[in-house]
């Protein structure tokens, strides 16, 4: 299992402990990928997982570029259309740095 896969597993477990329900993982489209799809009450939650072993380059949260955000939004829109879902959604980020988990709800 790669470091990225380990981080996604850790993030998934953490979010499940916080009351979210797992739906899908590593949803890939030619134009973007969604790390985790979760549900929280009536919301569908699209989660980007960022892992950094050290904070020397700005940390995991700063590693998310505007271009990445655009690709995630496009992938989420396609996911909702493909599954014929007309539901509220949000975009969260789980940042894992030095074994600490930071969950940013409605991050973008």
Curated annotation (Swiss-Prot):
Q: Which SUPFAM superfamilies match?
A: Restriction endonuclease-like (SSF52980)
| Annotated Pfam families | UPF0102
Q: Which InterPro entries match?
A: Restrct_endonuc-II-like (IPR011335), tRNA_endonuc-like_dom_sf (IPR011856), UPF0102_YraN-like (IPR003509)
- What molecular function terms (GO) are annotated for this protein? nucleic acid binding
HAMAP family recorded for this chain?
Answer: UPF0102
Protein family (similarity comment): Belongs to the UPF0102 family.
What is the protein named? Answer: UPF0102 protein Shewana3_3881
Species the sequence originates in? Shewanella sp. (strain ANA-3)
């Amino acid at each position: 299992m790669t470091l990225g896969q380990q981080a996604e597993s850790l993030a998934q477990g953490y979010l499940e402990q916080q009351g979210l329900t797992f739906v899908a993982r590593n949803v890939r489209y030619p134009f973007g990928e969604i790390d985790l799809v979760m549900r929280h009450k009536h919301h569908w939650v699209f989660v980007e997982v960022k892992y950094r072993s050290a904070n020397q380059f700005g940390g995991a949260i700063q590693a998310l570029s505007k271009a990445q955000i655009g690709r995630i939004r496009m992938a989420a829109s396609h996911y909702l259309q493909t599954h014929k879902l007309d539901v509220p959604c949000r975009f969260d980020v789980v940042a894992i740095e030095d074994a600490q988990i930071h969950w940013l709800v409605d991050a973008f």
